[in-house]
Amino acid sequence: MNLPYPIILASQSPRRRELLALTLLPFETMSVNTPETLNPTLSPEENVLAIAHEKADAVATILAHTKRQAIVLTADTMVAQGRHIFGKPSGFDEAFSMLQHLQGKTHQVHTGFTLRTPTINHSEYVTTHVTLNAMSSEAIAHYLHQQQPYDKAGSYGIQDPLMACHISSINGCYYNVVGLPLSRVWLALQAIIAQQ
């Protein structure tokens, strides 16, 4: 794939860096601090898109000052059941409560992403349905003590040791649950290159 500009992944997530590296495309990372505030009037899908846009706007401002051109990739992932959003937990108690709520049920993982060049602004979201097995309080506590997934939406990482034992089914893109829907990002990159 011949890129017209370098790719900048605007993310602090090590998982997103690992996933984008699977494409074998060269990229650099940039950290941007944005509020990532949820809008209660928006759906989870609309919220992830809004936050991805907000991050892309922040990077665009930085690039405008340096007169750099790039393909900017931003993303945001949320775990939800219907309109109820499960963010990143503040600690053990909140994480325990989230997993108690999610266990034995199906929930949705939404990732919104934005790809932006000087002339193109592409955004979309991807949804994956995940069902967790019933988990005892002991199993939840053991997982939390072992993995401490406090930096993850919904209080779990699908790729974590132990969590694999509790995933009953996945309907949709696995990589979306990890944090970046690679196949959709790849297709969007191809479309952007075709338009240059």
From Swiss-Prot:
Cofactor(s) annotated in UniProt: a divalent metal cation
Residues the record marks as active site: 76
CDD domains per UniProt: Maf (cd00555)
Gene3D superfamilies: 3.90.950.10
GO biological process, one term: nucleotide metabolic process
Main location: cytoplasm
The keyword Thylakoid is assigned to this record: no
Location of this chain's protein in the cell: Cytoplasm
Pfam short name (any one): Maf
A GO molecular function held by the record: dTTP diphosphatase activity
InterPro entries: ITPase-like_fam, Maf-like
EC number, UniProt record: 3.6.1.9
Site, Important for substrate specificity: residue positions: 15, 77, 159
A Gene Ontology cellular-component term: cytoplasm
Keyword Hydrolase: yes
Reactions accelerated catalytically: dTTP + H2O = dTMP + diphosphate + H(+); UTP + H2O = UMP + diphosphate + H(+)
Keywords recorded for this protein, A-Z: Cytoplasm, Hydrolase, Nucleotide metabolism
Cross-referenced PANTHER family: BIFUNCTIONAL DTTP/UTP PYROPHOSPHATASE/METHYLTRANSFERASE PROTEIN-RELATED, BIFUNCTIONAL DTTP_UTP PYROPHOSPHATASE_METHYLTRANSFERASE PROTEIN-RELATED
Family: Belongs to the Maf family. YhdE subfamily.
Function: Nucleoside triphosphate pyrophosphatase that hydrolyzes dTTP and UTP. May have a dual role in cell division arrest and in preventing the incorporation of modified nucleotides into cellular nucleic acids.
Protein name: dTTP/UTP pyrophosphatase
